Amino acid sequence: VNIDSYTKFNEDGSNQEVKENLTVRRFHAKYHNEVAILKIGIVDKTFADRLLLGFMGGYEYKQTQNASTMDWVYGARYTTANTLMPQLTYEKRFKVLKGLHVSLNGNYNFGKSYSADTASCNYNWLGQSQPKGVPGELSYMKYRYRDHNGAANFRMALFPADGQSVSLSSTLTTFSRSGKDETAYKPTYEHPSQ
């Protein structure tokens, strides 16, 4: 990464901006993603040309090196995500007129995500850190998300004659997210004594 300035951490705890053109190496930008997909089903049966049940499971780990601008440098922020998604695929061709083709595809994700910013220090582009009195490089958090999103698509195509087709398609999508910051202040209410 080419930078034109960086924050120098002095031994007395002070900071100063150094204007210098440097090429530095990213030190906190790892990314890891793995996915396993399993599909099982039947083909060429009287009730279905193709009927598949599937499952996709995935895991992602991503370190965050900088904010949307290069001015904010991070050295410990990261996110993780898990994907658990069942899937269904159905296709059938009927011998009506020149053909009727029906298909249904659907999936639903039961995902979880986690974002963490817990380091009690600041970093510069040289990979050096300086302790600070409060946790969080940007804002202290241990945020857990639950994502539930799904999609279903139904398509029906009719071929009344050569070179002609009529099709109908409908798609349904759904999304919901809930989250909780494990570091958030949780006030307790005490009932006043009588």
Language-model segments: which ranges?
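Periplasmic-side early beta-strands and strand-to-turn transitions of outer-membrane beta-barrels
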Residues: 1-75
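Face-selective signature of the C-terminal outer-membrane beta-barrel domain
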Residues: 39-59, 81-194
